[in-house]
A protein has these predicted regions:
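Short-chain dehydrogenase/reductase
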Residues: 1-56, 70, 79-81
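Substrate-binding pocket helix/loop in short-chain dehydrogenase/reductase
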Residues: 45, 73-74, 78-86, 168, ...
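Catalytic Tyr-X3-Lys loop
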Residues: 68, 75-94, 109, 113, ...
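Active-site loop immediately N-terminal to the catalytic Tyr-X3-Lys motif
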Residues: 75, 122-128, 150-151, 186, ...
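Active-site helix of classical SDR
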Residues: 97, 133, 141
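Alpha-helical segment proximal to the catalytic Tyr-Lys
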Residues: 102, 146-150, 207
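C-terminal substrate-recognition "lid" of short-chain dehydrogenase/reductases
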Residues: 109, 153, 187-216, 221
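Residue(s) in the substrate-gating loop at a strand-loop-helix junction
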Residues: 117
Length: 222
């Protein structure tokens, strides 16, 4: 929104948060709409993109940032929790990429940014499902980058480390302290750090970058 882009805010359950996000976008002088849709289903993705096109006429930028966790050690990790995470984090991104690519190929332009994670590169005990989903996003990113580059469409990934969010705030103090010790910068990042990376990949300045994974992690993945 700060770069002058109209915004479509997708949500599945968080209507209030989506409305607040849209309101913040409008305060910056752009148009914004919210769309309730489950992106882990083809029907939900189709609805999302149809409403986006109805609102603004085209889709120029896709940011796949849906993410859920269902943490547990492998011996306790249920098939249901594995499927829930893979469906939301990886299948949903695949379906959204497919809908976006269909339109961007016709436009001969577009930007796709996938939100991965440093756990895709490092692994993390108790997060086999989450790490697998985020590692899958990197493979998806690189494959689609090769498929779509000839149509002036870039596909890149941002891999955040420990970021100050509601989800990380709920971590036990011992876990949080251990994670901070593994970060050379010695601190957690801010949501703005991730947003700035995504905005860079969406901008004209990054038009010759595709298939890249940018770690926003204070050196955690080195």
């Amino acid at each position: 929104a700060k770069q002058g882009c109209n915004v479509v805010v997708n949500y599945c359950h968080g209507a209030t948060a989506a409305a607040e996000t849209a309101a913040l976008c409008k305060e910056l002088g752009v148009e914004a709409v919210t769309v309730q849709a489950d992106v882990s289903t083809a029907e939900g993705c189709k609805k999302l993109f149809e409403e986006a096109v109805n609102a603004f006429g085209r889709v120029d930028i896709l940011v796949n940032n849906a993410g859920v966790t269902r943490d547990n050690l492998i011996l306790r990790l249920s098939e249901e929790d594995f499927d829930t995470v893979l469906n939301a984090n990886l299948k949903g991104a695949f379906l959204c990429c497919k809908e976006a690519a269909r339109r961007m190929v016709r436009q001969r332009s577009g930007r796709i940014i996938n939100l991965s994670s440093v756990v895709a590169l490092r692994g993390n005990a108790g997060q086999a499902n989450y790490a697998a989903s985020k590692a899958g996003l990197i493979g998806l990113t690189k494959s689609l980058a090769k498929e779509l580059a000839g149509r002036n469409i870039t596909v890149n990934a941002v891999a955040p480390g420990l970021i100050e969010t509601d989800m990380t705030a709920a971590l036990p103090e011992a876990v949080r302290t251990g994670m901070l010790h593994s970060i050379p910068a010695g601190r957690a990042g801010k949501p703005e750090d991730v947003a700035n990376a995504a905005a860079f990949f969406a901008a004209e300045q990054s038009s010759y970058l595709t298939g890249q994974v940018l770690c926003v992690d204070g050196g955690m993945a080195m």
